[in-house]
Swiss-Prot record:
Pfam families: TspO_MBR
Functional summary from the UniProt entry: Binds tetrapyrroles and promotes the photooxidative degradation of protoporphyrin IX. Can bind the benzodiazepine receptor agonist PK-11195 (in vitro); this interferes with photooxidative tetrapyrrole degradation. May play a role in the transmembrane transport of tetrapyrroles and similar compounds.
Entry keyword Membrane: yes
Entry's family note: Belongs to the TspO/BZRP family.
Alphabetized InterPro entries for the sequence: TspO/MBR-related_sf, TspO_MBR
GO annotation terms (biological process): tetrapyrrole metabolic process
CDD domains in UniProt: TSPO_MBR
Gene name per UniProt: crtK-2
Main location: membrane
GO CC annotations, alphabetized: membrane; plasma membrane
Protein name, per record: Tryptophan-rich protein TspO
Single GO term (MF): tetrapyrrole binding
Length: 158
């Protein structure tokens, strides 16, 4: 198997695995916690989240593979990979905070940190591969929206 294809498959697989791990914290729509939260009228329907996140995780994995494909010997690559790993763990942490701990406040703290680390990752990736950085733009947009949604849910559920 071609090394680039293997790297791509492993990177996408890693991101999807983190997404799957995060989904274990996400309750079914009928769970008492989720149904008791007051949500804004513009809250997306529940069915929208899985396909959006799947696409985003595939794009994230592709971005990581592009950066790794430039070689580990560059300091910029190592910095980008570390930042990517941090934001990936913060992504997982949001599900654990918001749903697992049932805390919109903890979720908001986590998602703000996640947003910061996505931006830092994009900046680091841009030094190595502009296309890799651009692949993270939809992710940043979605997390920006999710941050505002999280903030609004916190306000509606004091």
């Amino acid at each position: 198997m071609n090394k680039q294809i293997l790297t791509l498959a492993l990177c996408i697989g890693l991101c999807l695995a983190v997404g799957f791990a995060g989904s274990t914290f996400t309750p079914k729509p009928a769970s008492w916690y989720y149904t008791t939260l007051v949500k804004p009228s513009w809250n997306p329907p529940d069915w929208l989240f899985p396909p959006v996140w799947t696409i985003l995780f595939i794009m994230m994995g592709t971005a990581l593979a592009k950066v790794l494909g430039t070689g580990w010997k560059k300091n910029e690559v190592n910095v980008g990979v570390v930042l990517f790993a941090i934001q990936l763990m913060l992504n997982l942490g949001w599900s654990a905070s918001f749903f697992g701990m049932q805390s919109p406040l903890a979720g908001l703290v986590d998602i703000v940190l996640l947003w910061i680390f996505i931006v830092l990752t994009m900046l680091a990736f841009a030094r190595v591969s502009k296309p890799a950085s651009l692949l993270l733009v939809p992710y940043l947009c979605w997390v920006s929206f999710a941050s505002y949604l999280n903030f609004t849910i916190l306000q509606l559920n004091p």
